[in-house]
């Protein structure tokens, strides 16, 4: 009797975990692109700017959110980081 109750409950829980796919691809794509752009900015000598530091902290937060499957927040943070990377490369 317990098996008839536990099995559907377990299936429901596993389905809920697998359903967190919204923003997953954009999070991964934006995060990879932003890290690459950050490396380029560092190579060009912009690592000391305030915008570079803001971008680095945003990317660290985005990576943490990706690990905890908070993909929407990850995507937003990585987009903001890319903005600050562009600002850094512009010297602002």
What are these regions (language model features)?
Residues 1-4:
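Positively charged n-region of N-terminal signal peptides that target proteins for export
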Residues 19-53:
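Amphipathic, heptad-repeat alpha-helical segments
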Residues 59, 66, 71, 78-79, ...:
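Inward-facing hydrophobic residues that define packing positions of alpha-helical scaffold repeats
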């Amino acid at each position: 009797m317990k098996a008839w109750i536990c099995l559907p409950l377990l299936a429901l829980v596993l389905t809920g975990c697998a359903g967190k796919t919204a923003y997953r691809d954009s999070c991964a794509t934006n995060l990879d692109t932003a890290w690459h752009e950050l490396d380029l900015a560092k190579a060009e000598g912009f690592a000391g700017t305030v915008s570079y530091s803001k971008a680095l902290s945003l990317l660290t937060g985005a990576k943490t959110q990706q690990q905890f499957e908070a993909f929407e927040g990850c995507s937003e943070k990585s987009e903001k980081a890319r903005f600050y990377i562009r600002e850094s490369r512009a010297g602002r």
